[in-house]
Amino acid sequence: MPNLTGKVAIVTGSTKGIGLAIAERLVNEGASVVVSSRTAEEVVAVAARLGERAIGIACDVADPAACQALVAETIKRLGRLDVLVNNAGAGIIKPISELTVEEWQIQIDVNLGGVFYLSKAALPHLSASGDGFIINIGSLAGRNPFGGGTGYNASKFGLVGMTEAMNLDVRHDDVRVSIIMPGSVNTAFGGGEQKAERSWPLEADDCALAVMQLLEFPKEAHVSRIEMRPSQPPRG
């Protein structure tokens, strides 16, 4: 595992599921972690549970001003930023005939807009760290379309392209950008999993381990994406 002592990370959508598992791993490896989601009470409670190296800052990633405020408060309280994990997501699975304009827009605003707003605000600080990393949590729905996925697939396909284009933009500024694309994960989030995988999904900590693997690579190496799917049914 990487030694993250002295590093500072923001993890969005980190009060439960994949985001919480990532935050726990980061803290365990020595990082200071900003736990973030839309609900102030939840982020404070989760941060307290994670211990003295975690703080909670609420943020609606669909709001550009809130994203700027999240980064500014992180720098004010922790002094630096080394890792940004864009995990917050929205998934509304409906055929296009039933999907409303508002439901379409929230998926675009959170799954694409939030990544753009927060990454843009964080980039100067990530570059200043000398070894910054943006890790976007995507989905296999970003390469495998399915019925009912008009909005969700569009946002996740777009996130793959955004990740790779962003990396080309910032690779000479001491920042790497990668995406982790899991299949079905055993969490409360219900967007975009294929039925064939739902009977034996990945665990949230599998995704957290993938984050640790990316952070363990030397800065001279870049893994653009990690695709994850269950290799076998659970035992027992």
Task: Label every PLM stretch briefly.
Residues 8, 15-16:
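Conserved glycine-rich cofactor-binding loop
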Residues 29-45:
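Conserved glycine-rich Rossmann-like NAD(P)H-binding loop of the short-chain dehydrogenase/reductase
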Residues 40, 59-70, 101:
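The beta1-alpha1 cofactor-binding region of Rossmann-like NAD(H)/NADP(H)-dependent oxidoreductases
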Residues 95-96, 103-105:
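Substrate-binding pocket helix/loop in short-chain dehydrogenase/reductase
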Residues 119, 155:
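Active-site helix of classical SDR
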Residues 139:
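Residue(s) in the substrate-gating loop at a strand-loop-helix junction
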Residues 172-175, 179-180, 187, 196-236:
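C-terminal helical subdomain
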